[in-house]
Amino acid sequence: MTVIATNTVRPHLGKAKLQLNNMLEVTKAFGDMGITARVSRVLFGQNAGCLVFSTFAANFTEAMADVQKVFSSEMWSKVQMRLDDNPASDIVMPLNLVRVAAGEMKPTHRVMNFRWYLMKKDKMPMAMEMFEEVKGMCEKVDVNPVLLTPVTGDDLSLIHI
């Protein structure tokens, strides 16, 4: 199971390059600490143009160890000071955790299209069965479906495919 932490920001007008460079700098620092981190751009929908910072961990134990590593680092203190002194973006979606419930993230499939569904928790077994059917259809056209469920956030009834 992969645990993903995400944070989505909207760059201030004229500061998109600065924000992207700041995020790439943090991504490198996380990599130096042994943490897998990525920056992506939202292309469609209400958050088009936003940047997403994501980290990936194999399980919750690793994810929490990574959080502890980051928050106790000197690098993170510098990032916080930079955010206070020269903000280059506004937070659109604060830091949240999701987990992979079915499928797997693959580096060969770098473009993602999220569909969000509101689902009662007691319907999750049915969704898992349907996911296997969707996965079979997607394999025919080289699409890699992944089912994500929220761990934190506003609405824990959402699933992401």
Predicted regions and their residues:
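Solvent-exposed loop and beta-edge segments used for protein-protein assembly and interaction
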Residues: 1, 47, 107-109
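Active-site-flanking beta-strand signature of metal-NTP-handling nucleotidyl enzymes
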Residues: 2-10, 52-54, 111-117
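A short, glycine/Asx- and small/polar-enriched loop/turn
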Residues: 47-51, 154-157
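Surface-exposed beta-loop interaction hotspot
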Residues: 89-124
